[in-house]
């Protein structure tokens, strides 16, 4: 039991050290160097952070409390957390904390938003600086609400006239660029005014090994060259081979029974040879005569 109590006590260092030529003397607060006999124990102080109304009362009593105020205004269609943070010189995390935002998309579910700014500053003293840019500036309403200063929140940077004008100029440039006619087209081309525009060269129709013809034209040409022309070629030479005469004479039968040979060019004319004609009665032979013969 004694050992547990000794272990529970914290070590207490010497309050002073006296050096002598032969030794060192350590002086403690209770006059003894034994840590087990020390009756003092280290106390750990835990500071609890108050919340709710008690936190507001304590924060109002501290010096510097009430230096932050909430600026409440109606939201426009083009507003975003980044734009509001740049415009009013605060942090996006402070805006989320003041409006209990979990995500940035929660902004579009509200009609008005609270923005933390410094009290007695340029943004709170001048109403013109509180109005947003664009057409929705006339509908802006400003309400000042006391914001208790948080211990963890750091001090916001001081807002000057030059910084305000700088962000105001950025917003004006963005607004002008959105409503300009340059971005209404499908593509945006920025060129120098004195730059000469080269004529557009039309792509040739013939491309590749087929010279740009259609597929059915290619099939027709292949059929014509591979089938039709060879058939005509064979028919022509067949006709030429069968049309040549076998002899150099042309025989003509004359009705009177003689045959006349017409002269052929390059040969001597010949006489006509008479051919005897038999009467019709002699040409018929009776069966009895043929049997007797």
UniProtKB/Swiss-Prot annotation:
Lineage: Eukaryota, Metazoa, Chordata, Craniata, Vertebrata
Primary location: membrane
GO CC, alphabetical: membrane
Organism: Mus musculus (Mouse)
CDD domains linked to this entry: LysM
Extracellular membrane side: 1-214
One of the Pfam families matching this protein, by short name: LysM
Domain (LysM): residue spans on this chain: 71-115
Name this protein carries in UniProt: LysM and putative peptidoglycan-binding domain-containing protein 4
Topology with respect to the bilayer: Single-pass membrane protein
Keywords from the named record: Glycoprotein, Membrane, Transmembrane, Transmembrane helix
Gene: Lysmd4
């Amino acid at each position: 039991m004694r050992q547990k109590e000794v272990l529970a006590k914290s070590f207490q260092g010497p309050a002073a050290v006296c050096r002598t030529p032969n030794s060192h003397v350590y002086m403690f607060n209770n006059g003894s160097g034994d840590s087990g006999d020390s009756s003092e124990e280290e106390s750990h102080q835990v500071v609890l952070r108050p919340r709710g109304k008690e936190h507001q009362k304590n924060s109002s009593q501290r010096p510097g409390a009430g230096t932050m105020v909430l600026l409440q205004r109606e939201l426009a269609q083009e507003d975003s957390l980044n734009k509001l943070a740049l415009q009013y010189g605060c942090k996006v995390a402070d805006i989320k904390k003041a409006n209990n935002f979990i995500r940035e998309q929660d902004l579009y579910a509200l009609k008005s938003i609270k923005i933390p700014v410094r009290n007695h500053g340029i943004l709170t003293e001048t109403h013109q600086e509180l109005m947003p840019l664009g057409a929705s500036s006339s509908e802006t309403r400003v309400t000042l609400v006391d914001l208790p200063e948080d211990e963890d929140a750091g001090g916001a940077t001081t807002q000057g006239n030059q910084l305000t004008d700088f962000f105001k100029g950025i917003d004006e440039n963005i607004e002008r660029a959105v409503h300009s006619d340059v971005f209404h087209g499908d593509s945006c081309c920025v060129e120098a005014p004195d730059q000469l525009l080269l004529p557009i060269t039309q792509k040739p129709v013939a491309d590749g090994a087929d010279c740009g013809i259609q597929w059915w034209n290619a099939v027709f040409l292949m059929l014509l060259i591979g089938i039709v022309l060879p058939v005509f070629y064979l028919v022509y030479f067949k006709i030429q081979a069968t049309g040549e005469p076998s002899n150099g004479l042309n025989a003509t039968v004359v009705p009177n029974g003689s045959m006349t040979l017409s002269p052929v060019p390059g040969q001597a004319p010949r006489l006509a040879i008479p051919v005897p004609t038999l009467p019709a009665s002699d040409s018929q032979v009776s069966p009895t005569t043929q049997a007797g013969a």
